Regions:
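Short, glycine-rich nucleotide/cofactor-binding loops
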Residues: 3-13, 200-209
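N-terminal beta-loop-helix "entrance" segment that forms/cooperates
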Residues: 38-54
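A nucleotide-sugar donor-handling region in carbohydrate enzymes
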Residues: 38-42, 61, 139-210
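Structural motif
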Residues: 2, 88-89, 194, 271
């Protein structure tokens, strides 16, 4: 049996890791295809190293672009690869444009499609990821859900129970696996008592007004804050000339994106 994984961003690499370990344990051949949606080394390559995942056989190198551009590039480049590799099944993860593009492509080729982290819903149709996850769920042959709520969501949408499999939260599985190995790492690099902050959602970086509201909110917090700066957030803060304000907040420690192991340590130690 040969299984193909299609991934494109950091959360998907994390979800892939525990699934890959199980496939290897059962001596199932696997192929990893990286769409290249995250192409910065700190945002991509380091995760494969730290999670001990096999390097991708192929990187589509789609880079950034509009939702339609990225989705179309992935579909056009992926189709031939899937046809040549002839996998017995394809696994997609989460709710990115990579997930959407892969789900459409694989479904049209009539190859069994498995969706890990299926059934999650925000019921906010303006959210791009919500659109992606709904389409991926309804095209998938088997849907691996993290919890009962997700399973119920799928049943309400008419998906038969025999296609829904309760797998639990693979992200949490990987967190427990990693933290057991790296509990004492990075001592001294960060404050003893801190709040961990990430900031990258499209709706939170879409306007100067929105960014200023978030800055005003964190300025009222009297704890040390460790902000992991996403490239998108870095770009818009620069475009709106707000770096001086960011630097004036003495409680705010801004750091570049970190690898997965370091992130699990930060999560384990933060307030």
């Amino acid at each position: 049996m040969k299984i193909m994984h299609i991934v494109g961003n950091r959360p998907q690499f994390i979800k892939l890791a525990p699934v890959s370990r199980k496939l290897i344990a059962h001596q199932i051949e696997e192929i990893i295809i990286h769409t290249g949606q995250h192409y910065d080394e700190n945002m991509s390559d380091i995760f494969f190293e730290e999670l001990n995942i096999s390097q991708p056989k192929i990187n589509l190198n789609v880079g950034s672009g509009t939702h339609a551009q990225v989705t179309a590039k992935i579909m056009s480049r992926l189709e031939e690869i899937v046809m040549n590799e002839k996998p017995d099944g394809v696994v997609v993860y989460g709710d990115t444009n990579s997930t959407l593009a892969a789900a459409i492509t694989v479904s049209k080729l009539n190859i069994p499609l498995f969706h890990v982290e299926a059934g999650t819903r925000t019921y906010n149709k303006e959210n791009p990821e919500e659109k992606n996850r709904i389409v991926a769920d309804h095209l998938s042959d088997y849907l691996f859900v993290p919890d009962k709520i997700s399973a119920d969501n799928l049943k309400k949408e008419g998906i038969p129970s025999d296609r829904i499999i309760f797998s639990g939260d693979v992200m949490y599985d990987q967190f427990l696996y990693s933290i057991s190995c790296d509990r004492n790492a990075y001592i001294g690099k960060y404050p003893d008592d801190f709040i961990l902050m990430t900031w990258h959602r499209q709706e939170n970086t879409c306007s100067k007004e929105r960014i200023e509201k978030i800055l005003s909110f964190i300025e009222k917090i009297h704890y040390k804050i460790v902000l992991l700066l996403h490239p998108r957030t870095n770009k818009v803060i620069s475009e709106y000339g707000l770096w001086t304000r960011v630097r004036e907040n003495k409680n705010l420690l801004v750091v570049p994106p970190v690898g997965y192991k370091e992130m699990t340590v930060l999560l384990n130690r933060c307030k």
